[in-house]
Amino acid sequence: MNGTSRPGDPLLHATRLEKRFGTILALDDVSLSVPHGQCYALVGESGSGKTTLLRTFNAMVRPDSGQVTVAGRPVGESDPVALRRSVGYVQQEGGLLPHWTIERNVALVPRLNRRTDSLERARAALDLVGLAPADFGPRWPRELSGGQRQRAALARALADAPDVLLLDEPFGALDAITRVEVQRIFAALRERLALTALLVTHDMREAFELADAVAVMKDGRVEQVGPAESLLEEPATEYVRELMHKAGVA
């Protein structure tokens, strides 16, 4: 995605976003910037606006006011193909199409993006996440474990070599051992590929372990943004303090 950002500028930038769903104010004057190569986590209770904010960066949600940019280009003005090439998306429990093989699932994004080598890209992405294409490519999603399905979903998001990865509670449905395994794969790939990432999670420990900075949300607003140390040592509001305590990290 050829935007107008310069070195040092945030790759993801939201300015004074507001979004209503009927009478519910889901985003209330929200601003957030994520620098190149950083992983930020969005945390907060259910209904705090985390997923709504995440989805403004790939145009799944259109804010009523404010501006969202990726690499300096307003998302609302971006060509859909260019946006999909730049921004990968992993949803909770993967979202694999059950009647498609794993290889076809992973090839979906490059195919939508008009790539002529979509199968080659899919196989390379499966390799990236540790799923041998010859073995896992012909299988159906139901034949894979939960961890393998989520790795395939991660491969699909990476298949067109995006600059940005958006992840909506990607590890929440996994058992404890599998969760750690997939988290390690994500962390290694993020470093290897120099990805910028925005992660939604309910797990404060997960946020602290995987993210460079954490944004705490409540009632559609961002209460505080910063590295784990600043949230623990200098919580900006009583809500942030209580959230740290409830999560057992304070």
Task: Outline where the language-model segments fall.
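Helix-to-loop junction immediately C-terminal to a conserved catalytic motif
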Residues: 58
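The feature captures the beta-strand-to-loop junction immediately N-terminal to the Walker
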Residues: 43-45
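Conserved catalytic motifs of ABC-family nucleotide-binding domains
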Residues: 161
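ABC ATPase "signature
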Residues: 225-226, 234
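Conserved ABC ATPase "signature" C-loop
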Residues: 219-220
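ABC-type ATPase nucleotide-binding domains, specifically the catalytic core motifs of the NBD
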Residues: 78-80, 100, 104-118, 127-130
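Conserved ABC ATPase signature
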Residues: 140-144, 148
